[in-house]
Amino acid sequence: MNVLPCSINTLKVLYDISGVEVGQHFYWQIGGFQVHAQVLITSWVVIAILLGSATIAVRNPQTIPTDGQNFFEYVLEFIRDLSKTQIGEEYGPWVPFIGTMFLFIFVSNWSGALLPRKIIQLPHGELAAPTNDINTTVALALPTSVAYFYAGLTKKGLGYFGKYIQPTPILLPINILEDFTKPLSLSFRLFGNILADELVVVVLVSLVPSVVPIPVMFLGLFTSGIQALIFATLAAAYIGESMEGHH
């Protein structure tokens, strides 16, 4: 099996699927490039919410924590436990990365259901979760790939590449392809679930615009949280695996 053409084909697939579109979209023309304005607007809102919440959380910490401080400490403890479980005792430096991924995806997923889209009128289409666009999920998956390569090389040096011939050199092509397909699985899983959830809600609202879609929306909120947890857990597991060796 020729690994290089397969790897190039994998990258080409990632590039091709970046043009996947469902529904009507609003674009900005910047220079010679089309920029997906819906994704950027919602992403900026999500980033503003996260930065604002973080600023409030650390601005005036109390010895006897308030309800808000308790909530943020619980979130931090949850992310630390998740990182420690998947990565091991050397989890500390990776908590900010895993936490950022989890919180951005979690708030992005929920923004698709909770953001009052009609507040901001767009010439075409309407606002949606950033994670229902394949470009966003690929942009989240690729840094994860860089992170586990970096973790492995930092811990083991060039000896990290020895995992590709474990348990036998015959598996070298398969082990290499496994690393190149990880970002594909991460991005497609998140993109597919969030897009499907929003499409189901839109169809139900158009058919029965009253009480029936509400349970589906609550189910979507639950699914959105689960998808953020799955992405963060897998990202941490990949980093832990690269530091510990082939399993």
Curated annotation (Swiss-Prot):
<dbReference type="GO" id="GO:0009535">
    <property type="term" value="C:chloroplast thylakoid membrane"/>
</dbReference>
<keyword id="KW-0138">CF(0)</keyword>
<keyword id="KW-0934">Plastid</keyword>
<keyword id="KW-0375">Hydrogen ion transport</keyword>
<feature type="transmembrane region" description="Helical">
    <location>
        <begin position="199"/>
        <end position="219"/>
    </location>
</feature>
<dbReference type="GO" id="GO:0046933">
    <property type="term" value="F:proton-transporting ATP synthase activity, rotational mechanism"/>
</dbReference>
<feature type="transmembrane region" description="Helical">
    <location>
        <begin position="95"/>
        <end position="115"/>
    </location>
</feature>
<comment type="similarity">
    <text>Belongs to the ATPase A chain family.</text>
</comment>
<keyword id="KW-0472">Membrane</keyword>
<feature type="transmembrane region" description="Helical">
    <location>
        <begin position="134"/>
        <end position="154"/>
    </location>
</feature>
<dbReference type="InterPro" id="IPR000568">
    <property type="entry name" value="ATP_synth_F0_asu"/>
</dbReference>
<comment type="function">
    <text>Key component of the proton channel; it plays a direct role in the translocation of protons across the membrane.</text>
</comment>
<keyword id="KW-1133">Transmembrane helix</keyword>
<feature type="transmembrane region" description="Helical">
    <location>
        <begin position="220"/>
        <end position="240"/>
    </location>
</feature>
<feature type="transmembrane region" description="Helical">
    <location>
        <begin position="38"/>
        <end position="58"/>
    </location>
</feature>
<dbReference type="InterPro" id="IPR045082">
    <property type="entry name" value="ATP_syn_F0_a_bact/chloroplast"/>
</dbReference>
<keyword id="KW-0066">ATP synthesis</keyword>
<protein>
    <recommendedName>
        <fullName>ATP synthase subunit a, chloroplastic</fullName>
    </recommendedName>
</protein>
<dbReference type="InterPro" id="IPR023011">
    <property type="entry name" value="ATP_synth_F0_asu_AS"/>
</dbReference>
<keyword id="KW-0150">Chloroplast</keyword>
<keyword id="KW-0406">Ion transport</keyword>
<dbReference type="GO" id="GO:0005886">
    <property type="term" value="C:plasma membrane"/>
</dbReference>
<keyword id="KW-0813">Transport</keyword>
<dbReference type="InterPro" id="IPR035908">
    <property type="entry name" value="F0_ATP_A_sf"/>
</dbReference>
<dbReference type="GO" id="GO:0045259">
    <property type="term" value="C:proton-transporting ATP synthase complex"/>
</dbReference>
<comment type="subunit">
    <text>F-type ATPases have 2 components, CF(1) - the catalytic core - and CF(0) - the membrane proton channel. CF(1) has five subunits: alpha(3), beta(3), gamma(1), delta(1), epsilon(1). CF(0) has four main subunits: a, b, b' and c.</text>
</comment>
<keyword id="KW-0793">Thylakoid</keyword>
<dbReference type="Pfam" id="PF00119">
    <property type="entry name" value="ATP-synt_A"/>
</dbReference>
<keyword id="KW-0812">Transmembrane</keyword>
